[in-house]
């Protein structure tokens, strides 16, 4: 398999279009659409006095587009994040290991024999996903459990964000940047992913460890209204 790692996109006021296109080639999974509409929405978000929600699916965290989401946080363009558990999975995994370039037409049976998973045109080796997440997360859950037994999911994601910043590549983490900026991350389906599976696994031996789903939903409603 190709061992060229997926890289984040980084732009600033001096970035040339040719440089951006070059970065697209290293980002993996990028699809550009409705740029004009997106620009208008972003303009309104920046200029108007409002609470800015950013919501997106997990797949872009597996690509270099994560770098753009990071810059949204860095530049104070988001107040609240609503996303899926997969966002936590891919963000944490890519701090601990690399994802690689692949192709949509690759043979999944052959990849499986090599211990490689395919996410569109991004390749995720087994050693880059479930295993490192489990090894990293379980000791942290023990620490959190020792502090208290009852958690709102967003509180756990905040704690994980602070912890991931301690890793060598922690500065690349979206979750870490949100934690540093005190931006709350809401995941309506907290068990629907690798991180969620680790929470469930931890609960097997800590049955008084609980997630306050309804309390979090009420808190999110208060922010909206």
PLM region spans:
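Conserved catalytic alpha/beta core of Sir2/sirtuin-type deacylases, generalized to analogous enzyme cores
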Residues: 1-56, 62-225
């Amino acid at each position: 398999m190709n061992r060229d790692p997926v890289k984040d996109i980084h732009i600033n006021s001096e970035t040339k279009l040719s440089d951006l296109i070059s970065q697209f080639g290293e980002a993996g999974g990028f699809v550009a659409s409705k740029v004009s509409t997106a620009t208008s929405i972003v303009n309104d978000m920046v200029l108007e006095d409002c609470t800015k929600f950013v919501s997106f699916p997990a797949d872009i965290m597996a690509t270099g587009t994560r770098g753009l989401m990071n810059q949204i946080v860095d530049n104070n363009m988001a107040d609240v994040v609503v996303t899926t558990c997969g966002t936590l999975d891919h963000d944490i995994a890519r701090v601990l290991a690399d994802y690689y370039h692949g192709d949509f037409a690759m043979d999944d049976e052959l990849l499986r024999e090599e211990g490689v998973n395919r996410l569109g045109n991004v390749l995720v080796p087994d050693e880059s996903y479930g295993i490192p997440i489990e090894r990293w997360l379980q000791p942290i859950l023990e620490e959190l459990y020792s502090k208290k037994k009852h958690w709102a999911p967003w509180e756990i994601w905040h704690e994980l964000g602070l912890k991931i910043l301690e890793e060598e590549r922690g500065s690349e983490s979206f979750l870490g940047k949100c934690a540093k900026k005190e931006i709350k991350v809401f995941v309506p389906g907290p068990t629907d992913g690798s991180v969620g599976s680790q929470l469930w696994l931890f609960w097997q031996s800590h049955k008084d460890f609980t997630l306050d789903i309804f309390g979090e939903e009420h808190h999110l409603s208060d922010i909206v209204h």
